[in-house]
Structures are given as structure tokens and as C-alpha cells.
């Protein structure tokens, strides 16, 4: 019988197809079509494998609208963990590899956030990345100051966390710069992605 490790290994190689054939000793896994199966025309008899899963490249997982909207290669988001745990290096690595990372600005002072903003904007230019905006009900000035900082440096994506309702700062970020294109479409350049925690 096939041990679990080869099964797991075969299943985790999602960029390759997998063929499963049942044998008396258990299932056999292969990433190649059995050699005696023709790839031309219709099969003349029963297909000599019991199950098949096609290759699924990482770039095809998830919502294609999301990847197009944010100019991503892969539909993956990482970060927005508070106190800079989601570091500038992590955000940069995600952006340089076709994914999106959010810097974890929650719990940091405005000068610390500004340092991270300057670092990432100088390194990444138009690459996809963003910053966290955490709701601060006990300190609305911090929330407003963070938004003003993001707008000052042209941060176009934020991950909004811990919001129980819309706040003036969050709404201001979203609508700042809203305009109508020549073709009549309304464009809001600042994007808000809601971070939902349980």
C-alpha cells in the first residue's frame, strides 16, 4: 500500500497533473499519462487510470478579478500584522514576486509608520503593496494622522482592521482624489481592503 508521504507529495505538486491507478497493493500515483495511453483521437477502450486531477498553476487559483484589479500574478495577500511584524522586507518580497503584502502599522507611532512608508515607496514605486489602518477608537487623532500620512505619500491601498463602523478617517481616505474620467466613469484611486478577524 502506498505510504501517506508519497500521496501528500504528489497532491501538493499542484502545477503537475496527477493520475491515480488502483492496484491490489493500493493506489499508484503518477504525474505522467501512462505510456500505453494515446494522446491522439478518442480512446478505444476503458481509460487505464481511476482518477485524474489536472495541473493547477498557482496563478490560476483564486479570483481573476482580484489579480487584475491589483496587478498581481498570484491572488495572495499577506501581512497587516500589527507592530511591524509584517515587515517592510516581507511586503517588498511579496510585491516583487507578483503578490500583495500589507505593512503592519497598527501599534506603531506616526514617525515609525512614516519611516516604513518612505522605505517602501522608494523601493517599490508602482508595485502592488499597502499599509494597515487599524481602528483607534481611543485615539481618533492617530487614525486621522495615519490616513494623512498615507495620502501624503500616495499610498493607494490599505488594509482596514478592527473597524466596527465607518469612521471619518476611513471614509476620507477612500474618497480623497475621487474623480470622473473623460468617458464618464467615476474613479476612486484609494483602495480599501477589509481585514476580517475572528
Question: Which role fits each region the language model picked out?
Answer:
Residues 1-198:
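Active-site entrance/lid segments in N-terminal catalytic domains of soluble metabolic enzymes
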Amino acid at each position: 500500500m502506498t505510504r501517506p508521504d508519497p500521496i501528500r507529495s504528489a497532491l501538493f505538486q499542484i502545477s503537475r497533473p496527477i493520475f491515480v491507478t488502483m492496484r491490489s497493493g493500493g493506489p499508484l500515483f503518477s504525474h505522467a499519462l501512462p505510456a500505453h495511453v494515446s494522446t491522439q483521437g478518442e480512446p478505444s477502450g476503458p481509460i487505464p487510470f481511476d482518477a485524474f486531477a489536472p495541473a493547477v498553476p498557482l496563478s490560476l487559483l483564486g479570483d481573476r478579478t482580484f489579480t487584475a484589479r491589483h496587478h498581481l500574478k498570484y491572488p495572495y495577500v499577506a501581512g497587516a500584522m500589527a507592530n511591524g511584524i509584517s515587515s517592510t522586507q516581507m511586503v517588498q518580497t511579496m510585491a516583487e514576486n507578483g503578490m500583495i503584502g500589507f505593512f503592519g502599522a497598527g501599534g506603531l507611532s506616526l514617525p515609525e509608520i512614516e519611516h516604513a512608508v518612505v522605505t517602501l515607496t522608494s523601493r517599490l514605486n508602482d508595485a502592488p503593496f499597502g499599509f494597515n489602518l487599524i481602528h483607534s477608537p481611543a485615539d481618533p487623532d492617530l487614525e486621522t494622522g495615519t490616513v494623512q500620512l498615507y495620502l501624503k505619500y500616495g499610498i493607494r491601498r490599505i488594509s482596514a482592521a478592527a473597524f466596527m463602523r465607518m469612521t471619518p478617517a476611513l471614509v476620507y481616505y477612500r474618497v480623497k482624489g475621487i474623480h470622473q474620467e473623460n468617458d464618464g466613469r467615476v474613479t476612486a484611486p484609494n483602495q480599501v481592503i477589509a481585514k476580517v478577524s475572528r
